[in-house]
Amino acid sequence: MEHQLFGVIEGFYGDPWSQLERLACIDALAGWGANAYVWAPKAEPRHRDAWQDPFTAEELSNFATLIHHDDRITVSIGLTPGSTATIDDIIIKMKPVVDAGCRIITLCFDDLPVLDAGRRHRELSHGICDQLGVEVLLVPTHYAGTTSSPYLEALCDGLDDRVIVMWTGNSVVTDEISVAQANTRAHVMGSRAPLIWDNVPVNDAMMSSHLHLGPYVGRDPKLRDVVSGVLLNPMISMRASLPMIESACAWWRGENAIDAWSQCVDRDDWRIIAEATAYPGELHWPGDRPSRQWFEQVVALPPCTDPDISPWVESARSGARICLAAYDVMEGIASGSLASDLTRIALPLLNLRQWLQTPERTLGSGPRTRPVFTQDETGRFAITSGVIVLTTSIVENFVHDVNRALDALEATS
């Protein structure tokens, strides 16, 4: 491949983006200096589950529109072939896509129980390159970690340079990717620079309770010098994915990713909900006990019409109301009010149980679950720390404060 790729791979589980959302993403990517978009949504039936079925005329027309929408963005169309797929099967399936203008095919062999298929995946890739005259982005079955495996050895032994192999980092989702890790992965792939499938800000599967609205962090700037590129896997909400994508594009350009994110969330009014969906340790975490003014800003968030975002907005507003009630109670105690005078203003505290049961996690509520799995020397997944992180929410902190204040009040009565 003549140049590195940077952009987005729509590769999540869950409701795929619409055509309009994909076009809007391509517009944003082009404006921010990226150069790639990959269509590979797991829930699109003819991408994965019904992979042998021909793409419909509408799908092919949509692909052509994406491919030719902006010549600054290279569009690749992906396929997850089944375990019995032959080269001819894939040629028949993908030739209409190539005829529509696609010059890079993405073959996705991730999350398949075929760790003995390295040689076969190499041969399928070569067949596609040779017979369709395209380059191939390949998602291997062993896609995480830095160890070698029989699968990777078989895949990379004699693999054509027209095939670029993806890698997610040391685990499926990872907080950091270093140059040393990328170099080790390149070594076990026969000195082939990996193309990073970066699983941020994705919120599918076990992460579906979370919104990831923070900046692009934890990626060594020098990674740009040792990889074939970086593709971000976004969230089900295209719009909510944009703050991190814009931040990542700044990182790719060698600029300050944090500053770019900050400008984005202020410009597009994301900051408060971004802070409300953060966790301790993240740069946009508002603190364990934010101010009354901050909670008032959360409550004042306007209702959201986007169904992929609105549940988190409502969850944050509900939690903030509880915290404001806690402020009222504690200020009442401090001013000398009797417990009987505080009953009415304390009633919102009783909503804590219902709020904790809300599926959408906000204000630090847990548990926080992420697929922090690596792959070992056999290619099998291995659990690591961080898969489940137990947290105490901001709301619980304030309710604890109220209880302590009431205990102290009773002790002095």
Q: Can you name each region flagged by the protein language model?
A:
Residues 40-41, 77-81, 108-111, 140, ...:
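Glycine-rich, histidine-containing beta strand-loop boundary motifs that form or position
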Residues 1-85, 99-103:
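Feature activates predominantly on carbohydrate-active enzymes
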Residues 9-11, 93, 99, 103, ...:
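Catalytic-core regions of glycoside hydrolase
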Residues 253-413:
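C-terminal functional modules
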Residues 51-52, 87, 116-119:
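Short, solvent-exposed loop/turn segments at secondary-structure boundaries
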Residues 38, 106-108, 231:
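Conserved beta-strand positions in the central sheet of alpha/beta enzyme cores
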